[in-house]
């Protein structure tokens, strides 16, 4: 895989990404307002250089205002709409795959009341509508809730991972490499967290 671009409003996040992917094009911008022309041109250039490659759009959407860690605090309605801004990227770059990472409560995305609190009877309504809208661009969708520690991360957080794939492209999630207790099995060993 070759990472060719990154958009993030946080300069520290961009600096970290640039250190790990120095050949990628970096934009320290808000995804809602980024002028897409340079990104579109860069992707077109990469498609010519690598005509058999798949274009994957990875989005780690802001999660603070979905997370249960927010407790009973009011949510920022604007921050909860960042997923809606994905559509202009889909239309501009027509990726083969879209991969999403977020807190598992992202699936409960629904309306807020006048005090900024989630309306329980609407839990999941906006999420389901959003998934249907992305699928309307010709994608199929599968999601999983995965524990990052099962894949070698130094934290044991359960996270939402969603994959949208065009047409008949395969959707595959990785097999775990670790487990809480570790295990030896017929097909290999799972390392202990």
Model-derived features: positions:
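Class I S-adenosyl-L-methionine
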Residues: 37-53, 63-193
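Anionic group-transfer/hydrolysis microenvironments
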Residues: 10, 32, 62, 103-104
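Short glycine-rich loop/turn motifs that provide flexible caps or phosphate-binding loops at active sites
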Residues: 4, 59, 151
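Redox-cofactor binding/interface segments in oxidoreductases and associated redox assembly factors
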Residues: 29, 58-59, 100
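Residue-level recognition of the N-termini of beta-strands and the immediately preceding loop/turn
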Residues: 2-4, 53-56
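SAM cofactor-binding core of SAM-dependent methyltransferases
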Residues: 1-35
């Amino acid at each position: 895989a070759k990472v060719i671009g990154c958009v993030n409003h946080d300069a520290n996040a961009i600096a970290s990404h640039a250190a790990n992917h120095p050949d990628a094009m970096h934009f320290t911008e808000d995804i809602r307002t980024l002028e897409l022309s340079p990104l579109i041109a860069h992707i077109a250039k990469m498609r010519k250089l690598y005509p058999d490659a798949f274009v994957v759009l990875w989005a780690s959407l802001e999660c603070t205002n979905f997370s249960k860690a927010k407790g009973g605090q009011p949510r920022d309605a604007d921050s909860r709409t960042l997923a809606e801004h994905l559509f202009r990227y889909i239309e501009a770059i027509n990726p083969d795959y879209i991969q999403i990472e977020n807190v598992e409560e992202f699936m409960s995305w629904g309306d807020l009341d006048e005090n900024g609190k989630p309306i329980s009877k609407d839990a999941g309504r906006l999420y389901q509508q959003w998934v249907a809208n992305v699928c309307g661009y010709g994608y199929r969708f599968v999601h999983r809730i995965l524990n990052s520690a099962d894949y070698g991360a130094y934290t044991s957080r359960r996270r939402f991972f969603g994959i949208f794939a065009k047409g008949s492209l395969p959707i595959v999630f990785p097999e775990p490499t670790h487990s809480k207790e570790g295990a030896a099995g017929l097909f290999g060993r799972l390392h202990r967290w």
